[in-house]
């Protein structure tokens, strides 16, 4: 008898994984706690636009959604940095300026994946099913629904239900399971810049950043010519603003160029929810019980902060890896899932660390003259040494090099450039010394000649 496969969560990863499995002839039931988003619509202030790059596009290509997704996205070729004075400075993502990350609404992409999975033969979607319990000894799943409790059973349970995974709770206190949840002191809140006279109010070819040291705001363009803004402030900073007047005054001081672009500034700031920012790590991701096997996928296994734009891209790579492992093991779930977690764990830890580091870069270092000079130097090396020197940002966003290999590659590159710089400095110093010695020798000869003439 074929394995009964259940996916918990019909978000980005859950829908993509369902389609990949269906293409293998595997029947899948997908359970989602929310109502069908095609009917209910998105939650207020909860979108945080996605930046889909090479890894995500490669995964979407596996199910034929690459071009459709790109048609619903806007390319961003660099960062537009907004100074407190209102000045702007464009910083391309790549040395040649040709590479772009793609801004797409989370809702838009989720809808496309949802509809694709629904069309796939063998996929059954169950909305308004909130998982309450997974019994690993029997393989039974218990759900809360508008019509009362519902029970289902599965041999394979794939937890794609996000950072606060209900499925993961069934193994949280098992012996040998390690789990960490590290929150930033910052939270996120969304604002909206509507079109201005039917046009974009800001340059749509860039990801806009307002770096302010301890905090920042970003804005990503949408197809309807609006921008989705996200504030990344500390809880204390959010709590300090209680009235519309205080909100407007704060923005006029620190974000003066956007005050007139956000007509609902005070209302959105007061009423949109504050999202938490956490890095979640756990191990193992795969658990075997007497009744079923549970595998954690995407944020359920490795939630990361959004500052490298890799959360969805990374989760999509998980789904593709599971599909590849099933290929390699001729459909043996036990062997496939064992290979999946071994291959992905180090990669996901690496991007989690890089995402945290990129937060400091975006809100603070990006304003530094030293950082700007360093970026210019890297772009120079990329142009001079194509393929041999590649920046970290390009390796993460524009290649599919395993995340875990990138830090070591950067260390090798940095050592090589440091040696090259030292060599150039040494050569320049030697030339200067030779020049000075030559000048002294010339002066001495001229002095001797003058003495002879006298």
Label every PLM stretch briefly.
Residues 1-13:
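Beta1/beta-strand and adjacent pyrophosphate-binding region of the FAD-binding site
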Residues 324-453:
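C-terminal helical "tail/cap" subdomain of flavin- and related membrane-associated enzymes
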Residues 40-116:
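Active-site-adjacent segment of FAD-dependent monooxygenases/related oxidoreductases
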Residues 115, 129-133, 138-277, 281-289:
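Conserved FAD-binding catalytic core of PHBH/FMO-like flavoproteins
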Residues 5-7, 28, 294:
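Conserved hydrophobic helix-helix packing surfaces used for dimerization/oligomerization
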Residues 22-45:
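Glycine-rich FAD pyrophosphate-binding loop
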Residues 13, 36, 164:
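Conserved Rossmann-like nucleotide-cofactor binding loop
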Residues 10-23, 158, 191, 275-361:
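Conserved mid-domain beta->alpha element of the FAD-binding
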